[in-house]
Amino acid sequence: MKRIEAISIIAREADSQGALLVGNIGYPSRELFAVGDRASNFYMLGSMGLASSIGLGLALALPKWRVIAIDGDGAVLMNLGTLATLADQDPDNYLLVILDNGCYGSTGSQPTCTSRRADLAKLAVGAGVSEVKVAATAGEVRSDMAKKGVLVVKVEIGNADVPVIELSSEEIIERFMARSAQPSPSS
């Protein structure tokens, strides 16, 4: 499955759940913007490795909201501490989706450790995350999107040909803050 296909499924599921959605820096955010821009999406523009932490912080600060974060394997490898913090806090309203293509896709597709030996699902289990799933098909992604914890999605290497995000960082944060300040759809 291509990454943009997985992101399309995630975007549709997040929308149907009324969830806040945090997109990883670079091409994943660009692909998310292209397939399903909405005020409930927060696009990371300059902090590699922190989408998972920002998503977790949102879930803890806004417990009535469902929060989903999309991060890449390279980004999570740069911030493995987020898995232990996620395990420790264990919020029911948070799902971290790790798109694992075995490379740093936004910087030239240099291989990550997951292309060889590192297994992010096993790392999450080792950190104590209560629910960890691995998906490789569209059906598996769809069926696991209502869960909490960590979902590792195996995707192909490659960036979709999508334009840059047409919003400034100020516009992204202002509309996201305005949306997240409203009651969650599930309240």
Language-model features: where?
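Active-site pocket-lining segments that scaffold enzyme catalytic pockets across diverse folds
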Residues: 1-18
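Thiamine diphosphate
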Residues: 3-5, 34-175
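Generic structural hydrophobic/aromatic packing signal, biased to beta-strands
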Residues: 10, 21-23, 86, 151
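Short active-site oxyanion
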Residues: 17-20, 130-131
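Acidic-glycine-rich active-site phosphate/pyrophosphate-binding loop
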Residues: 19-38
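Short, flexible loop segments at boundaries between secondary-structure elements
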Residues: 174-187
